[in-house]
Amino acid sequence: MNDIIKKIQNQIQNNPIIIYMKGSPDAPSCGFSAQAVHAISSCGKKFAYIDVLKNPDIRLELPKYANWPTFPQLWVNGELIGGCNIILELFQKGELKKTISICDKLNS
């Protein structure tokens, strides 16, 4: 296993909610990342992020590791939730907040 995969695994394991995105939550660099961050932020939970534009090694390796080709990618409790479309669908159904709230139950 290469060092980048280990780094990704460590990030996912050490952050109950993490999004791999283009840009930052305050300054997204693409519309999909902006929409995803807005939905996640609306749930009222803190989350970590990794800017894949500033981390080209992660941008290259994460799609292979996750078997998910695009960004953003939302991970909750070590599980890939999905990209922008799935995040927005869960948000619109009211299920994103429930999914993210699982972190409270598992970490208490």
Swiss-Prot record:
Species annotation: Buchnera aphidicola subsp. Baizongia pistaciae (strain Bp)
Keyword vocabulary terms for this entry: 2Fe-2S, Cytoplasm, Iron, Iron-sulfur, Metal-binding, Redox-active center
Compartments it resides in: Cytoplasm
Protein name, entry field: Glutaredoxin 4
Entry binding sites for glutathione: K22, R59, F71, C84, N85
Protein residues bound to [2Fe-2S] cluster: C30
Keyword Acyltransferase recorded: no
Main location as per UniProt: cytoplasm
Keyword Cytoplasm listed: yes
Gene Ontology MF: a single term: metal ion binding
Domain Glutaredoxin: 5-107
Family: Belongs to the glutaredoxin family. Monothiol subfamily.
